[in-house]
Amino acid sequence: MLPVFHLGPFNDWQEEAMRQRALFPVAYPGPQTRQRVKEVLGFCCGPEPALDVRSEGTWERDGVAGEAVSWSAGYGPRTQAWLLKPAGAQGRLPGIVALHDHGGFKFYGREKIADGPEPADPVVTAFRERAYGGRAYANELARRGFAVLVHDTFMWGSRRFPVESMPENIRRMAAQRDPAWQPTDGSAHAEEIADYNYAAWLFEFHVIEKYCALFG
């Protein structure tokens, strides 16, 4: 264990904590360890099925057949998702759940890695160039023979928090956007997205991280 040097007069805190007990408990593979991990992380111990699953429409473009689906996680807004398959595919396919990145970009979720029925937002296209080599990788996987489920995760896209629901202090800080969060093309639309992404980052750091630590 590397020594701690940035805690000032509390630099010996780490040493005392390690003296009282091992930093990492011994965890042998098996059901007991899996159960302990669930308890520590606050996972639900029972089944967690998607609720009220709905099909919202279908499309086909560029060799991919898509279906828009949505479901309830039991709290918050409905989760919007796309199920992508090779066009014309029949029968069962190997499946992949494709997850988008964090990227400090919460305005969109699934759109960052997948093309849906409409052309991608230019802001998303620019982001893909930086993060994914310009590709919608979920569609690439579908064209190669996979059934790919792409959904908005908690805090992104359809599951994002509206700015008006954020505390006043977060909105005040967000009004003074850090220059590092400037959009690339300078359009009004890009400015709106950059404003939201900065506010959402502040909200995650100052508020949501704390709730997640408490709720699991």
Provide a role label for each language-model segment.
Residues 76-79, 86-96, 102-105:
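Proline/glycine-enriched tight loop/beta-turn segments at coil->beta junctions
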Residues 57-61, 88-91, 140:
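Conserved, well-structured beta-alpha core segment at the onset of a catalytic domain
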Residues 84-85, 137:
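Catalytic micro-motifs at enzyme active sites that drive phosphoryl/nucleotidyl and oxygen chemistry
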Residues 1-65, 73, 109, 144:
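N-terminal targeting or regulatory segments adjacent to alpha/beta-hydrolase or S9 domains
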Residues 81, 91, 209-212:
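Mature, folded catalytic cores of secreted/periplasmic enzymes
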Residues 100-216:
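Cap/lid segment of the alpha/beta-hydrolase catalytic domain
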Residues 70-72, 82:
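Residue-level recognition of well-ordered beta-strand positions that form the cores
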Residues 66-68, 78:
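Short coil/loop residues immediately preceding or within conserved phosphate-binding loops
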